[in-house]
Amino acid sequence: MQLIRILVTSKPDMTRYRHVEDAYRISLKSLARRYLELHDEISELDIMIAAIVDDLAPDLIKCKAVGYECASQRLITVGDNPERLRSESSFAALCGVSPVPASSGKNQRHRLNRGGDRAANSALHIIAIGRLRTDAKTQEYVARRVGEGHSKLEAIRCLKRYISREIFTLLRNRDRQINSVQITT
């Protein structure tokens, strides 16, 4: 960041743009200025997203390894019409974490669903990896699954489904609270 601030304050000779070194200096100053503008805009938007998530789903942020970006993606996935998601399995299918049978002969296996909202699936993956790094229960769960003969990726697929179930329950309870407040007022 210090280098970027130095580049922004630099004063290249704008009349010597035909020289390669000066053209580089001019471009670097322009890129550094644009970087700082975008950095400031991202910071402002992160603050807005955090405020929105805190208002709409404070319980979601309290979950392990769920940050504001992942929580906001969950809210975007559910949308303004949560009634369309009748069960946690429909939510899992929407997120692309419902199991798809991929059996062959004697092997009974499931693979990850490649459909659904890929951004929601990515957010679930970030949460799963965060929990795998920091949560002892999650580490034990994955170790147990690997001990049962599953690969680590299959164990993570199961973990993503579990997290999806947990988040669906939180969001459904949130919607019930919002609806009960609207009915009473």
Give a label for each model feature.
Residues M1-T185:
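A detector of single, family-specific signature residues
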